[in-house]
């Protein structure tokens, strides 16, 4: 007992020391309002007016983004000589002291985007010139001109990555990037560049990635950056792209010319490693078959290139611009949103490695599938939103789509496809033929691939998983329409009467279907077989836009997660038993735009508690010719509904019968009371003389 006070004192002492130690750790972790972790000081958005002076001197990364610093003084960073990365994004910087980075010999990355460095660019340039080891510099969003940028980049020969995006640069010449022999990545997007003088990039022998998107370049002629691997010139006003002639080997792998005004297919290098070519949203077309080109002189264009005192003339064959281009390594080609009316002979044959071809939203009317076209490596082909009325398959090519996995033919004018087009398509998983007026073949189509039958046959395409036939004007399906397939996604929306009173045509794919869309197909509750119990793997079911008056039937182990019943004729919500069954798996249900009776929503509370009604605020019901939101339904509605359920004829009879009986009794009493006087009055009034 005598030792107890001693133990208590020692325990209190150790607890005090531990509390102080932990408090010190917490303070260190958030010193000066900044978060510290493994040499990184995160001071972003702290409303700091100057660089904190109480951070660990050994900090390697300092993040000061979104602070109103305005000025970076000469001594602001003197305490942090080990900095390797400094970020000053959106700090309202107008001035950087000329020796602000004097102690930062280890600095490798400097981010200064979205400031106002153009205000004192000369002093800023002087400060940057001391960073001999800098590798990454971000000057985007500083309202810099080309002269300002040239001064700031002067003598920074160690730079490997530079961003000058979102400035006001208009012209580029050899002086802007002079001495940047190690530069590998240059971002010039979102400027006002309309001219690039010859030799502007000649000194950038290590340049691999160049971004010129969102500028005002009218053309790129005599392109000769052989060392470049990716070039982005999207969102300009390019009308021509011509690589330099000769057999020089280009390292170019990705070329983005999308969203320009190109009229002709670009003249690409004769020897390159190009694997991605993006030509979306231009005005391109092939013209050889559209004009009378009997004279060779009518088929060429000459470009006069003036560079100082040197004049070069480049002659281009307008009708065969792709003939000399090296497309052997091309894997991804996007030609969507152009004016292509046809593909010339041999065009696709030059691309044996092509795996993705996008020809969406062009003017194609007829497509001839010839030998080795499409290439055997083709995985995805998009021909949607054209004017295709015919597909021609060369004889002897029934398995030309053997590698194809996705085939999009939607929004065309097709009535059918060549017989055998899908034969031996062992990998075909997705087909979209929506918005074509096609019909499904009642019997296997003819094996003659020469013509185009007026139907399409998907049977026995074992690899097919997703099929879209929306708004195809399909007639009633036969029971074997999808026999031999393992569909997981099926869209039959917009085909009124396609099921003809029964979902039996879908039984072949019922065990595998996961997503089924039957929107606007004319379903009614009078269907004798509108029972989805056999669809045990169904995850999503769309029954909107039909004429259902009651809930469809579900049974067995239900896996349904999404159910859409909008725009039907439902007057009552599902019964409690159905709601409890759906609650096990259902995550989302749509119930709005139905003429519900407010007296038929007794189970609304139970359904609401499940929190699965996605359009809860839009569900309404009718009560005494009024439309009321279910969420605003008053508490007294059940009493009103009890009165509305009473037979009104019986009610009127009960109200009128006592009144009639009372009136009859009153009349009888009156008659009996005044019977004798009344008879005398009648006799006196009706008395007349007799002739006798």
UniProtKB/Swiss-Prot annotation:
Which residues are sugar-modified?
74, 155, 232, 292, 309, 312, 408, 500, 622
Primary residence: membrane
In terms of Gene3D superfamilies, this protein maps to: Ribonuclease Inhibitor
Q: Where are the transmembrane segments?
A: 649-669
Family, according to the entry, reads as follows: Belongs to the LRRC32/LRRC33 family.
Described by its record, this protein's role is as follows:
Key regulator of transforming growth factor beta-1 (TGFB1) specifically required for microglia function in the nervous system. Required for activation of latent TGF-beta-1 in macrophages and microglia: associates specifically via disulfide bonds with the Latency-associated peptide (LAP), which is the regulatory chain of TGFB1, and regulates integrin-dependent activation of TGF-beta-1.
Name of the featured protein:
Transforming growth factor beta activator LRRC33
Q: Gene for this protein?
A: NRROS
């Amino acid at each position: 007992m005598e030792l107890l006070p001693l133990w208590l004192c020692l325990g209190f002492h150790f607890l005090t020391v531990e509390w102080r130690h932990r408090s010190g750790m917490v303070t260190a972790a958030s010193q000066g309002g900044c978060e510290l972790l493994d040499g990184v000081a995160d001071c972003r958005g702290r409303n700091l007016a100057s660089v904190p002076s109480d951070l660990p001197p050994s900090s390697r990364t300092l993040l000061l983004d979104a602070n109103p610093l305005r000025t970076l003084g000469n001594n602001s960073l003197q305490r942090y000589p080990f900095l390797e990365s400094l970020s000053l994004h959106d700090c309202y910087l107008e001035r950087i002291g000329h020796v602000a980075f004097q102690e930062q010999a280890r600095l490798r990355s400097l981010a200064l985007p979205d400031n106002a460095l153009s205000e004192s660019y000369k002093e800023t340039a002087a400060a940057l010139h001391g960073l001999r080891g800098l590798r990454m510099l971000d000057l985007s969003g500083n309202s810099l001109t080309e002269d300002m940028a040239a001064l700031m980049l002067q003598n920074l020969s160690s730079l490997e990555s530079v961003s000058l995006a979102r400035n006001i640069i208009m012209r580029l010449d050899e002086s802007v990037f002079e001495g940047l022999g190690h530069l590998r990545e240059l971002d010039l997007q979102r400027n006002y560049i309309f001219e690039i003088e010859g030799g502007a990039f000649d000194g950038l022998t290590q340049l691999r990635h160049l971004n010129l998107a969102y500028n005002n370049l009218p053309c790129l002629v005599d392109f000769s950056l052989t060392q470049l691997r990716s070039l982005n010139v999207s969102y300009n006003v390019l009308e021509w792209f011509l690589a330099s002639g000769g057999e020089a080997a280009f390292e170019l792998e990705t070329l983005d010319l999308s969203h320009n005004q190109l009229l002709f297919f670009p003249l690409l290098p004769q020897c390159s490693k190009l694997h991605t070519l993006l030509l979306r949203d231009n005005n391109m077309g092939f013209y050889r078959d559209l004009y009378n080109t009997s004279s060779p002189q009518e088929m060429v264009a000459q470009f006069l290139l003036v560079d100082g005192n040197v004049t070069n003339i480049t002659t281009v064959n307008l009708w065969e611009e792709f003939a000399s281009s090296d497309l052997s390594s091309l894997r991804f080609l996007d030609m969507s949103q152009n004016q292509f009316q046809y593909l010339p002979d041999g065009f696709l044959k030059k691309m044996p490695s092509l795996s993705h071809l996008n020809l969406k939203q062009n003017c194609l009317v007829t497509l001839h599938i010839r030998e080795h076209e499409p290439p055997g490596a083709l995985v995805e082909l998009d021909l949607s939103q054209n004017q295709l009325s015919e597909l021609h398959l060369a004889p002897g090519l029934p398995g030309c789509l053997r590698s194809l996995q996705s085939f999009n033919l939607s929004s065309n004018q097709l009535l059918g496809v060549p017989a055998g087009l899908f034969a031996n398509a062992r990998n075909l998983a997705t087909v979209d033929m929506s918005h074509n007026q096609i019909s499904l073949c009642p019997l296997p189509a003819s094996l003659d691939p020469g013509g185009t039958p007026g139907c399409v046959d998907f049977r026995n395409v074992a690899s097919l998983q997703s099929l879209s036939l929306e708004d195809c004007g399909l007639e009633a399906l036969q029971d074997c329409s999808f026999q031999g397939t393992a569909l997981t996604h099926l869209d039959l929306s917009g085909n009124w009467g396609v099921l003809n009173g029964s979902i039996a045509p879908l039984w072949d794919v019922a065990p595998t279907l996961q997503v089924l869309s039957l929107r606007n197909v004319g379903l009614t509750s009078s269907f004798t077989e509108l029972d989805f119990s056999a669809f045990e793997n169904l995850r999503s079911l769309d029954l909107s836009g039909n004429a259902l008056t009651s809930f469809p039937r579900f049974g067995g182990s239900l896996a349904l997660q999404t159910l859409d019943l909008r725009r039907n004729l439902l007057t009552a919500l599902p019964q409690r038993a159905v709601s409890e069954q759906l609650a096990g798996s259902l995550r989302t249900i749509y119930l709005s735009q139905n003429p519900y009776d407010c007296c038929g929503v007794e189970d609304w509370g139970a359904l609401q508690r499940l929190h699965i009604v996605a359009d809860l605020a839009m569900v309404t019901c009718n009560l005494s010719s009024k439309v009321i939101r279910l969420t605003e339904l008053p508490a007294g509605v059940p009493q009103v509904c009890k009165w509305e359920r009473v037979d009104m004829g019986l009610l009127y009879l009960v109200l009128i019968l006592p009144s009639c009986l009372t009136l009859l009794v009153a009349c009888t009493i009156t008659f009996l009371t005044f019977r004798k006087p009344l008879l005398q009055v009648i006799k006196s009034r009706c008395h007349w003389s007799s002739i006798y």
